[in-house]
Amino acid sequence: MNPKSPLFLRLSDRLDVYLRLMRADKPIGTLLLLWPTYWALWLASDGIPDLAVLAAFTIGTFLMRSAGCVINDFADRDFDGAVERTKNRPFAQGRVKKKEALLLTAFLCLLAALCLIPLNHLTWLMSLPALFLALTYPFTKRFFPIPQLYLGLAFSFGIPMAFAAVGNSVPVEAWILFTANVLWTLAYDTVYAMADKEDDLKIGIKTSAVTFGRYDIAAVMLCHGGFTLLMAVLGAVIGAAWAYWTAIPIVLLLQYRQYAAIKSRVRQICFETFLANNRIGWVWFTAIFAHTFFAK
């Protein structure tokens, strides 16, 4: 195909728009979804996850995160133009139609559903509330005072699904990890919301940063503390090897650095602090990986 032909240019433009809707150029959301899923897979499989299961969760996570981003932009299409960080998104620029976004969301969800084929029926069953949470979260910002809590539930469902896929059951340690991840998500997404707080107040969007008001930093740190405490409880429940416990002082240091950074409440610093949570996910994965190695 001639790269200068109208058809090629049209297809290139659509592909660019769809990839931007999916946040394909911003992998942080996928990583923050993958880390807890990997924690669960490694714990449930004693450090040796089945490759087919690992591939299904990795690809499925990318697809569902992408679908969530598309439906989020659809839900926020009337607001994104008024927010500094989102004013260049496809809907805000008038580059995409509502029908296109809905069809793309459906297509991505269909592809994600195909990833369930090699998994057991319990995992299929648990995918239904996960799908519901992922697709409805963007609309909670209109009426729920802490939508980040709802997002935490959506971002944590990969954990019980992973345990279900490996062992065909969801033991107590899965729910401890689930609750810990809800708190971690609430912490880092509140920091994310702090970056948009001024704009959200103007347009009337509800976020945890708006709801917590001047206590937003305290709320973030309480959630971080609860997350780390529950990870310690999890370690005790599973009889974690020494390597697991090395993560706690490292994570506490990273959390303190986040506290020192967000005290300024500067928009860009809050956004960079949100991105830094990828390190916490990586540290805990490394600790869990090492635990499964040394516990054998």
UniProtKB/Swiss-Prot annotation:
Its main location: membrane. Keywords: Cell inner membrane, Cell membrane, Magnesium, Membrane, Transferase, Transmembrane, Transmembrane helix, Ubiquinone biosynthesis. It catalyses: all-trans-octaprenyl diphosphate + 4-hydroxybenzoate = 4-hydroxy-3-(all-trans-octaprenyl)benzoate + diphosphate. Pathway: Cofactor biosynthesis; ubiquinone biosynthesis. The chain crosses the membrane at residues 28-48, 51-71, 102-122, 143-163, 174-194, 212-232, 233-253, 274-294. It comes from the Bacteria. It is found in: Cell inner membrane. GO terms for cellular component: plasma membrane. Its EC number is 2.5.1.39. Catalyzes the prenylation of para-hydroxybenzoate (PHB) with an all-trans polyprenyl group. Mediates the second step in the final reaction sequence of ubiquinone-8 (UQ-8) biosynthesis, which is the condensation of the polyisoprenoid side chain with PHB, generating the first membrane-bound Q intermediate 3-octaprenyl-4-hydroxybenzoate. HAMAP family: UbiA. Belongs to the UbiA prenyltransferase family. This is 4-hydroxybenzoate octaprenyltransferase. It comes from Neisseria meningitidis serogroup C / serotype 2a (strain ATCC 700532 / DSM 15464 / FAM18).
